[in-house]
Amino acid sequence: GYLKADFTQERFHTDFTTWYLGWIASQVDLHDPAHHKHINPHQLLDNLADYDFPAYEGFLTSLGVSMHLSWHFGYFTRAQYPLGISLMADIIRSGAGKNPFWITEMQGGNVTASGREVLCPTAREITQWLWTGIAAGAEGVIFWTLNQRASALEAGEWGMLDFQGRPSDRLPAASEVARTAKAHKSFFRE
């Protein structure tokens, strides 16, 4: 009796996830073949072994990544968050293959209770994170979320708007990045 590493269960999980996502994509195609198919892996750095991104290229039309910094960036200090964004973007860009990749959940506002770390991004950080994602090749960035929920676990958190529904300083910062990227679209598409 020597101990041996047995990853049969983990391999099954990865293979089953790939099969199941492919099956879901086939069902979407059955009913709406023109519909885009996209997934948004959560906790990427902790769950990377669960995914077989190259296998997804055949049935997805784009690949995204969730970047809730207060959840997903425990390996980094706050000053290193741009490095974490770049790392996760590189992983997803590589995994997307010929398909585009998006940052489909970028933390947009404060988190005090529904994350692992208390964090309220500054307008400068939002600007830096967006440019880091764009420089890494992301075709788009979607924030979580525009406005805070009124109830439940995430109540009062994550929003780009303040508690009175007015833009926080983060929203105009994000808008300025979007305006600049749009004004120089050909440069960013090369």
Predicted features and spans:
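Short amphipathic alpha-helical segments, especially helix-boundary/capping motifs
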Residues: 1-4, 65-67, 105, 152-156
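Short glycine/proline- and acidic residue-enriched helix-loop micro-motifs
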Residues: 2-11, 162
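Short leucine-rich amphipathic alpha-helices used at interfaces
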Residues: 7-8, 14-15, 80-81, 86
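Aromatic-lined carbohydrate-recognition surfaces of secreted/lumenal glycan-active proteins
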Residues: 10-50, 99-110, 141-146, 190
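Short low-complexity stretches enriched in small and charged residues
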Residues: 13-24, 55-64, 151-159
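Substrate-binding cleft/loops of secretory-pathway carbohydrate-active enzymes
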Residues: 31, 36-75, 79, 110-122, ...
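Carbohydrate-binding surfaces of carbohydrate-active enzymes
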Residues: 77-190
